């Protein structure tokens, strides 16, 4: 089994993400009913990478206007399209990532609606957000957790926009992901170990990805 990996913790975290789908739907429905003109998907480091598949999902399935931004670059650029009619979506496990907090604060100063995903509702990022989704996690299971939650939010926003007719089937698939992803990990343990042993001393690694895998590639690199 993967070193330091705990099946119970993995399932608890991902099932926790699934349990938040109802709250995510409530948030998506409310902001959709209030109306917005564009969506900002913002992160720092790994969070910027992990939200990338949601950007690709919107790109290939929706007419919604979206922007995928690194928090610090957004602060430097101060895009004119970030306004009171924007949704600002971000995440931070600790809720203390300074660039993300600063970007969220700036977005709110422009009147944007801030939705954040955090591991602790008492963290600073939550305090500067309009809507907060809380689910405790750790680095071993954060990626799967955020994918479930980001995809649930994106799918609901598209559905409320009169798009994504496969919404119900998609969400039912998301609900199955904790067990499915655990099985994938277990099935690939030996393969991953063999790869690591073979290439642990390899001097140069090239990480290649495209489409909805680009973010994972960026994160790994």
Model-derived regions, located:
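Glycine-rich phosphate-binding loops that contact phosphosugars or nucleotide phosphates
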Residues: 33-177, 210, 221
């Amino acid at each position: 089994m993967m070193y330091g990996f705990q099946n119970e913790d993995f399932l608890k975290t991902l099932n926790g993400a699934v349990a938040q789908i109802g709250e995510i739907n409530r948030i998506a429905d409310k902001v959709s009913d209030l109306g917005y003109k564009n969506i900002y998907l913002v992160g720092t480091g790994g969070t910027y990478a992990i939200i990338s598949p949601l950007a690709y999902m919107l790109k290939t399935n929706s007419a919604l206007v979206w922007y995928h931004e690194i928090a610090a670059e957004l602060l430097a650029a101060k895009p004119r399209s970030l306004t009171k009619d924007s949704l600002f979506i971000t995440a931070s496990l600790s809720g203390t990532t300074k660039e993300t907090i600063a970007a969220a604060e700036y977005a709110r100063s422009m009147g944007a609606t801030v939705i954040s995903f955090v591991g602790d509702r008492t963290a600073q990022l939550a305090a500067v957000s309009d809507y907060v989704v809380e689910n405790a996690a750790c680095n071993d299971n954060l990626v799967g957790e955020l994918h479930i939650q980001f995809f649930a939010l994106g799918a609901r926003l598209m559905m409320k926009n009169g798009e994504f007719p496969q919404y119900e089937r998609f969400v039912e698939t998301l609900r199955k992901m904790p067990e499915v992803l655990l099985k994938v990990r277990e099935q690939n343990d030996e393969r991953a170990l063999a790869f690591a042993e073979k290439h642990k001393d390899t001097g140069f690694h090239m990480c290649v990805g495209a489409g909805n895998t680009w973010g994972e590639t960026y994160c790994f690199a």
